[in-house]
Amino acid sequence: MSKVQDASSKKTKTISKDSKSLRNTKQPHHSLPSSLGEEGMVRSFSKDIETKSLRKRLLTLANKYETSSFLNGDPSWFMHQVIGKRNQETIAFIAACLSYGSRQVFLPRIQYLLDCSRSEPYEWIKTGRYALDIPNDNQCFYRLYTNAMMCDLFHALRKMYEEYGDMENYIRNYANLQKGSKKTDAITAIEAICDHFLKHEAIGIVPKNTNSSCKRVCMFLRWMVRTDSTVDLGLWSDLIDQRSLIIPFDTHVIQQSLQLGLITSKTASMSVARKLTDKLLEIFPNDPLKADFALFGYGVNQK
């Protein structure tokens, strides 16, 4: 064999050996970041499916229960029994204030007040005629509310009507002073209502501030603001954006929301109520309180 052939043979062997070495060398593994990895994508996909499934479930329940039959045995029924925007606003607020405890007990008390007003609750308050029907004493009117407390509530409401005409206009003025805008959000409206009754020393019925969940005030605002509903009136839809409404938050809503995994806290505070509402906004972006009917329906189906 010639020297040239020998050199060529050696070179071929070297290349073959180097190729084998390269094949045996482990190549670096370029994995995706954890947030984009397969596991993360599966979790994200699963969460998306769960959200869609929950939305479908809640929407079905909401459509089933948000009907005119819902009014039967509900305090919202009273605002549908009077004529005129101011009458509806007035009896709705009074009904909301009394809506706690047993419906079999508080519904007749609301009916009593409506009867006293002869279905004209706005004038009954504004003219002070309530004083002829409700004695200013410490006798019980309903549960923790005395006659005197009810008189204080009506007196503060009368002052509001004398100065601003109605509650809607009072909140509009309050929002204008606070934010320089004649349209506002629900939390500002709640603050406005709390501030007025505290200022006029109507204590024990309307919350002093927004530290608590203000469940009954939130329910009243739902009645006044939500549109396209057979239950809610939507009288203030041009004042408050319904997307800013806060869920009326009580023990029943807490239990149902915990079971559905919407919240983790059992505290009936405004902060937890707003966190739940934020979750509901993800499901119902334009109308979070439609979910109030769904949660009610979910509770009924659990019994």
Label for each model-derived stretch:
Residues G37:
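Conserved hydrophobic ligand-interaction patch in extracellular adhesion modules
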Residues K3-Q5, D18:
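Short N-terminal alpha-helical targeting/association segments
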Residues K3, K10-K11, K26, P33, ...:
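HhH-family (HhH-GPD) DNA N-glycosylase catalytic core used in base-excision repair
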Residues D18, N24, H29-H30:
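Intrinsic-disorder-associated, low-complexity terminal segments enriched in Asp/Asn/His/Tyr and depleted
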Residues S9, I15-S16:
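Ser/Thr/Pro-rich low-complexity tandem-repeat tracts
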